[in-house]
UniProtKB/Swiss-Prot annotation:
<dbReference type="Pfam" id="PF00886">
    <property type="entry name" value="Ribosomal_S16"/>
</dbReference>
<dbReference type="GO" id="GO:0005737">
    <property type="term" value="C:cytoplasm"/>
</dbReference>
<dbReference type="GO" id="GO:0003735">
    <property type="term" value="F:structural constituent of ribosome"/>
</dbReference>
<dbReference type="InterPro" id="IPR000307">
    <property type="entry name" value="Ribosomal_bS16"/>
</dbReference>
<dbReference type="InterPro" id="IPR023803">
    <property type="entry name" value="Ribosomal_bS16_dom_sf"/>
</dbReference>
<dbReference type="GO" id="GO:0015935">
    <property type="term" value="C:small ribosomal subunit"/>
</dbReference>
<comment type="similarity">
    <text>Belongs to the bacterial ribosomal protein bS16 family.</text>
</comment>
<keyword id="KW-0689">Ribosomal protein</keyword>
<protein>
    <recommendedName>
        <fullName>Small ribosomal subunit protein bS16</fullName>
    </recommendedName>
</protein>
<dbReference type="GO" id="GO:0006412">
    <property type="term" value="P:translation"/>
</dbReference>
<keyword id="KW-0687">Ribonucleoprotein</keyword>
Amino acid sequence: MALKIRLRQQGRKNHVVYRLVLADVESPRDGKYIELLGWYDPHSEQNYQLKSERIFYWLNQGAELTEKAGALVKQGAPGVYAELMAKKNARRAVVRQKRRAYRQRLAARRAEAAAK
C-alpha cells in the first residue's frame, strides 16, 4: 500500500479550503484518508496549520509528498523539509560514490585488457 501526503479539497463554491492528509495512492482526491496532517486556507491571513511531527513521522515511514503538498510543507514546516532534503541528498551521494567506484573499476579492467 503506497501512501502519499496530499491536499484534499473541502469548503464551498468560490471558497475552497484544503486539508493536508495522508492517503492511499489509489483513493480518490476527496475520498477516504488515513490521517489528517493539517489544513490550508488560501483566503485567510493565517492560512495554514501543519502537524510537523506527524508529517516527519510519515515521511520516515516511506510516504511521499505530492508537488503541491511539498510546497506547503516547505513553507509551513521548513525544518521537516530541510531534513527530508538532507536525507535525499545523502542517499544520492552514496549512489554517486558507488557509481564512481564502479566506473573506476571498469576503466581499470579495460586498461588491463588493452595492455595484454
